[in-house]
Amino acid sequence: MLAVGIVTNLVLAAVAAPFDEIERAYSPYMQADDTLAFPMKIKSLASDPYKFWRGSKDLFYHWCKSNTTDWLSDKPAFIANHGDLHLGNIGSYAAEGKFGNLAFGMVDFDDSGRLPFQLELLQGLITLRLTAEQNKIELSAKQHGELSKALFDTYRTAVNSRRNATDLLGENQWITKLLKKGRKHEYADELQEYIGADGKFLRATYSKGKLKEILRPADERADDFAAAIAQALEHSPEMARLFRSTRLDDLRRSIQSIAQRTRLGSSGSQGLKKYFILLDKPLNDIDSPIILYLKQEIPCAAERQNVIPRDARSSGERCADDMNHLTEPRPYFNSWCEVAGESYWVHFKEPWSDELDPADVTDFATLLQAANIWGTVAGATHREEGRFEMILPHLTLALLSQIQARTDAYLAQLHEDFAAFQADERVTKLIQQADAAVQSHAGT
């Protein structure tokens, strides 16, 4: 039986209309006349409560301002957080060293920031509970307690360990299967999926006959992106050492094709700009074209909601720095640049990495396994901050009770917000615009 600790009073923190808060947060950073931008963001959020959770973190941090004031005033507990650690942001990634190396941990640092570690744990339990709801896994009161305790205990174990997430999860069958699957692929597989016979990006990609991505040609921006790549290499000596040349004219000549990417399954960053850039054999010792991936970054959700001050770094720099800081081993490609006043994270498109799929959680046993993975990844990463001596004394039954109560409260708020969002006429109209835009690209 869990001891009941002190639980702060929970405050009604609903925004006037969820749509308005999301529009204020995202539309300033999106191209107003692009129906594959903000309308696609809205379409994604309206899909189901789980995608709404993944892509509406402004509503979560707005709620936290009123309902987690004790944590937000606990300044020693502030550490580098991922900020949006749902299951789709945990997975394998291309790691430093040999081309094709894989490691396991946090990915996609769009919402990273210095926050109380307790908020990361709260997001973990919310994610797991929503995963159960989405997959129609009914939990008894006893199972609710077992789930939160599994998350808490594995987090504590990982914080107290001296090993990274890849090592700690080396025997986990889910993870070994994920890594094994990724290692089967060749880089040529990726090029074949995206590049046509003319050496240019295809206009769309498909998975099992369904439209997966829309790729809009952007070759006219080659000069801008050559300068951006040169800037990214200047920002990352590790990345620059991989390139045959870092000269601007050589980089410009190596650009073969550029496409603006829209991935239909995206949630959190849906509507922001992403670009693929095909470079002709730019790397030392790698006799292959490479696809660079530039992803627009904006202030994190906690910054947008004034939970924490604006970072002095650009959003792309914050994202790249925090990825280096919070992953062990470090990623193979990781830098940042500015393009036309917008901030971008610079990575590369490869076939090896993959994320956890919530659809693989089919019963309580696999839900517990997901909790163990989440707790291990978060705990090992937070330990890398060197703050385990601060974190461990905080991990009391009282904190666990708080996290359980606040999870219940936020889930009630989220479902209320989601219902209001779906019922908003503006959402309906924007979904129609997004559907028309997608349809116009189908079959291209």
Describe the predicted segments one by one.
Residues 1-9:
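Bacterial N-terminal signal peptides
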Residues 17-45, 61, 216, 220-241, ...:
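ATP-dependent kinase catalytic cores of phosphoinositide-metabolizing enzymes
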Residues 430-443:
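Short, amphipathic C-terminal "tail helix"
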Residues 188-267, 278:
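Acidic catalytic cores of enzymes that act on phosphate-bearing nucleotides/polynucleotides
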